[in-house]
């Protein structure tokens, strides 16, 4: 039985090694995974012989697809075997993959970089001693023409479009940041090198590179936020919000959410109302964009008790603004024979033709955005009422504290009634229902006032 198992291992190993150098990337990937799993099941002798065999193939086989397959196998073996069992082989693995990462052929260095990222994630803290050499290698790679999107020889330039190196380099930087953790604050040289590389990649025109660079920044902010220029970051993320490239837009939203979660008050000083309006504007353009509502809601929850009036002003502006696309749609809707549109006329019930034309300069925003603004008004009333901040509901008490009443919730009751009543008579059912909810909130606030 033992002999049969051994023969099975040898046969499988031989087949996998033959497929490993195949020109088909799917077969190479499957073969490398199979070798990695075999190494995790077999003993130390198999693991050692497999590593030696891969090194020999890399040295003797100059075929780029074969070298790429061997790089994949190194990554698969280390990730499947684990850091403890494969620890003695980490130095050999890293040296081989770093050497292949500098190979000018796009196929070789792309898969070698991928394998290296996989090894770093699997090794975790055990990789600490290789951080400096890895960052130095990444800096050299960034300066090499062969690793650019259209760099190197003509043949390689045509291939590199399918195997972009820079996004994977960013993934490696991200993995290195995770390995360093809070220790990244101790080495100024390492910290500076990481920040400089990430900054350069964030300026690239390619969408994939920028997205990965943003992820690196997010990880860096977790461990050393005091070494990052937050105002410049906010301006950069804000610029990406209007990008036509959805992944870049979503990455910026996630990064802004992280900053808001960390310190919403500071974000209010940096971004101000305009940044929140920009986020609302994204809902106008595409209500399905993930994360926007989460950012705004988190921001509101953390800051509304300090200045509810400012948030009410913001919601008021959102509910009365327009977009260029709506102006075109509403102009078409005013033509004879056209039916009404929920998107453009959510709060336009009861308006005459003349009234609609007179208010064309202040047309309403899309109804889903209006609905979310109403939900924000509901959150404002609820959060302030539950905060225990008596001054927001008691004018005499606020005056006794010497507080200006203009920023308090109680001073905005008339505006809340107006917005809630207008919404409760809207054309769209969802807005009518939310308007009634806000109206109920206002009644509760007014009831508290009468009991003071």
Question: Where are each of the predicted segments found?
Answer:
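Extended, low-complexity, acidic/polar intrinsically disordered regions
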Residues: 1-452
């Amino acid at each position: 039985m033992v002999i049969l198992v051994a023969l099975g291992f040898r046969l499988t190993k031989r087949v996998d090694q033959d497929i490993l150098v195949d020109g088909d990337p799917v077969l190479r990937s499957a073969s490398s995974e199979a070798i990695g799993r075999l190494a995790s099941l077999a003993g130390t002798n198999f693991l050692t012989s497999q590593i030696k065999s891969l090194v020999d193939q890399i040295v003797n086989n100059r075929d780029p697809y074969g070298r790429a397959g061997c790089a994949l196998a190194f990554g698969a073996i280390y990730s499947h075997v684990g850091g403890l069992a494969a620890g003695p082989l980490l130095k050999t693995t890293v040296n081989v993959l770093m050497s292949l990462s500098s190979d000018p052929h796009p196929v070789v260095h792309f898969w070698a970089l991928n394998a290296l990222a996989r090894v770093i994630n699997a090794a975790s803290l055990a990789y600490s001693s290789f951080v400096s050499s890895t960052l130095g290698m990444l800096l050299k790679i960034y300066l090499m023409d062969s690793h650019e999107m259209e760099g190197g020889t003509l043949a390689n330039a045509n291939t590199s479009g399918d195997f972009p190196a820079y996004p994977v380099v960013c993934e490696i930087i991200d993995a290195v940041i995770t390995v360093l953790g809070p220790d990244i604050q101790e080495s100024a040289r390492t910290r500076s090198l990481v920040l400089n590389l990430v900054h350069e990649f964030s300026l690239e025109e390619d969408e994939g590179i920028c997205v990965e660079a943003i992820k690196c920044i997010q990880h860096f902010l977790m461990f050393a936020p005091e070494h990052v220029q937050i105002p410049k970051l906010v301006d950069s993320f804000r610029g990406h919000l209007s990008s036509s490239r959805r992944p870049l837009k979503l990455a910026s939203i996630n990064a802004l959410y992280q900053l808001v979660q960390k310190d919403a008050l500071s974000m209010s000083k940096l971004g101000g109302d305009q940044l929140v309006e920009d986020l609302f504007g994204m809902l106008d353009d595409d209500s399905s964009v993930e994360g926007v509502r989460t950012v705004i809601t988190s921001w509101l929850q953390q800051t509304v008790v300090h200045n509810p009036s400012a948030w009410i002003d913001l919601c008021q502006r959102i509910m009365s603004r327009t977009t260029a696309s709506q102006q075109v749609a509403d102009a078409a809707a005013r033509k004879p024979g056209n039916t009404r549109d929920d998107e453009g006329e959510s709060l336009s019930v009861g308006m005459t033709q003349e009234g609609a034309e007179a208010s064309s300069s202040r047309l309403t925003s899309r109804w889903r955005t209006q609905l979310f603004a109403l939900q924000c008004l509901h959150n404002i009333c609820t959060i302030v009422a539950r905060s225990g901040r008596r001054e927001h509901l008691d004018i005499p008490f606020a005056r006794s504290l010497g507080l200006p009443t203009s920023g308090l919730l109680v001073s905005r009751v008339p505006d809340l009634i107006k917005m809630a009543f207008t919404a409760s008579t809207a054309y769209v059912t969802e807005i009518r229902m939310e308007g009634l909810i806000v109206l109920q909130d206002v009644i509760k606030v007014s009831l508290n006032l009468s009991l003071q």
